[in-house]
């Protein structure tokens, strides 16, 4: 405006034209501003509509998000409750499992200790088993030896019983033949008074051999007659001939006394064996009675001593008694000891 007031016009028309041009200019500016205002209003209405639509959309979305937030919050609360519950349950379960684990470790330690003890006991049992097996084998070996020894001793006892039976039979025959002897003495008194001095000397030697049975008589004068009695058959034949009534020769008598001495020595050895067997069996089975064996041995020895004491009588009876004691049995007596290791006594039995 100051610029306009400072203008100097030359005429009124120039001033009017000037002011007209200025009015036109401002009018054009006003129209442009009005147009811009309308455009701005239209754009503002469009923006407002868009903003309202966006606001509505945002509000709807906000409501959805709020509801979703509420739902998620509720889910979170439920999950928290479930987590707390699960955590408490897990804590209890973990505590229980820890207790079970400690108990299991204690049981495992006890079982390991028990296994070590069982292994040690197993080793001890194996050593004891080996020792027992060795002792059992030793015991079986000793038992087999004892069984063999008992069987051998039982065989000897059976042989001894057979010997006792034969001795009893000989005693019976001796009793019968004594009666016959009494009859023959009445019939043969002249013959009994004609005994030669040589026969008396031989009877004296027979009595000496009876007194010491452990030392058999083997003088030079008897070697020839002893050679004739080496075989059981010849000795048996000579003894059978003794029953025919002819007296025994001095050689036969001395051989018979030697056999009696051998018999006594063998009986003594058998008694020592039976005594050792009795001690062994007493150690194995203390309750087994052995008095019968010792009694029978005693009776056998007494019987043999009685026969020897009878044999030391008169010179006439000695030959007949030797024939009775070492003579042949009847034909029905079995020859069961011909090959026995007991010698001539078994051959007689």
Swiss-Prot record:
Major subcellular site: cytoplasm
In its UniProt record, which GO terms are filed under biological process?
cell division; cell migration; centrosome duplication; centrosome localization; chromosome segregation; establishment of chromosome localization; establishment of mitotic spindle orientation; microtubule nucleation
What's its job?
A: Required for centrosome duplication and formation and function of the mitotic spindle.
Q: What is this protein called?
A: Nuclear distribution protein nudE homolog 1-A
Q: Quote the subcellular location field of this record.
A: Cytoplasm, Cytoskeleton; Cytoplasm, Cytoskeleton, Microtubule organizing center, Centrosome; Cytoplasm, Cytoskeleton, Spindle; Chromosome, Centromere, Kinetochore
Q: Which PANTHER family match?
A: NUCLEAR DISTRIBUTION PROTEIN NUDE HOMOLOG 1 (PTHR10921:SF2)
- A cellular component annotation (GO) from this entry: centrosome
The record's Pfam families line, in alphabetical order, gives: NUDE_C
The entry's family comment says: Belongs to the nudE family.
- The residues forming a coiled coil are 22-189
